[in-house]
Amino acid sequence: MGKNKALLSLPGNQAVTFIEHLVSLLEECCSETLIVARDQAHAQDYVFPGVRVTIDETPGIGPLMGLYSGLSAIHTTRAFVVAVDLPCVQRALLSFLLSQPLPTDTLLVPLVHNIPQVLLAIYPRSILPIVREQLLQGRHDLRCLLKVAPVQFVEEVQLLQNDPQLCSFINVNTPEEWRGLF
């Protein structure tokens, strides 16, 4: 995309960035808010009162390293993970996912069009050894965890009750996708 997506403005509110919106939303629902930054330069852009920032243990490896770094840094038993390029996460969906009963070692992953939405999911801290093993095997994509860790999927019909347009899963990766939000 050529620029830090976290600092792009939200549709309908040019004064609020993706990261500001997500931090505000997560602070309402979660006991701890942690941002995982790619590197020190990005971390400097993510200073918010009461929010900790950690840096990828090995920059440039991808989302799986981000998850590993985040799970290593949290003080809670699980993390609600939201990618910064999902700027339209709905509060009702977030609350619904967080309210789901879940065994302590199980991932909670929404399904949209039968595709696992690993960038908006709940990950238990207890899977750190599994994540580490996947990294050591050269894997970088969060989807690899779906084959090696216990997973509870949330069906689309349940998601639609809390996010009728499934806006929460709109991923912004290109300037065209960002402009399409407006």
State where each predicted segment sits.
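Nucleotide and nucleotide-moiety/phosphate-recognizing core
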Residues: 1-168, 179-182
